[in-house]
Amino acid sequence: NRVIGIDRDADALKAASEFLAPFGDRVVFVRDDFRNIREAVEGTGAAPVDGVLLDIGVSSYQLDNAERGFSFRFDSPLDMRMDTRQELTAATLVNTLGEDELERIFREFGEEAFARRIARAIAARRAAKPIETTGELTEIVLFAVPRKFHGGRVHPATKVFQALRIAVNDELESLKQGLAGGMGILKAGGKMAVITFHSLEDRIVKNAFREASTGCVCPPKFPICVCGHKPAARLLTRKAVTASVEELDMNPRARSAKLRAIEML
């Protein structure tokens, strides 16, 4: 048996290849966006496969590495690229997008209640000087968000940073294509499991799995099925699986993780 590891982050592949070196050629690494999972796996000659695991979103390494610019905990270049080969950075978006587009990104990808205020504050600040660091952006967000919302468990900049990261890396579209591609390379009886970390991701996975496991799609008023639609998979998780208390003790960042799984028919 072989494992194919796909990631667009060269640092992640380097760490994984060193950790899994004892397994030799049983592990193959491909530097790519998992939206291209089908082409990547077929390129290794491994398709069809027995299982697919997608671990979505930013990694602890990326969050904890100041140079990558993913976190408001450090004052570092406003980068957020998972694939450092791409040109688009968070600084590019913050300094070039129109105020309305920034508001849309914060609202759509961050579900940020103060999206308009934050976008307006960014536009005002960059008119005087380009916004280049995570510290500068965090300062702007703290200025824009009313002070009474500063004391909660979630930092006021969390949703803005999430939204920019998703936009820079086109994460939701990658997820949609990765789900379709992953199901496309599974053999009958093959299983796919997906771990997500926020509601936007989980909603996409939930809907994709529901669609794949749905049979008849005729209107409810039809007395008999005429569509002939057959389910391609069956749900293995009726509800998302969340981390246990023991898991949270070992890994507090798993508190928002949700796992869903299906089996191809």
Locate the predicted segments by residue.
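S-adenosyl-L-methionine-dependent methyltransferase catalytic core, i.e., the SAM/SAH-binding region
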Residues: N1-L265
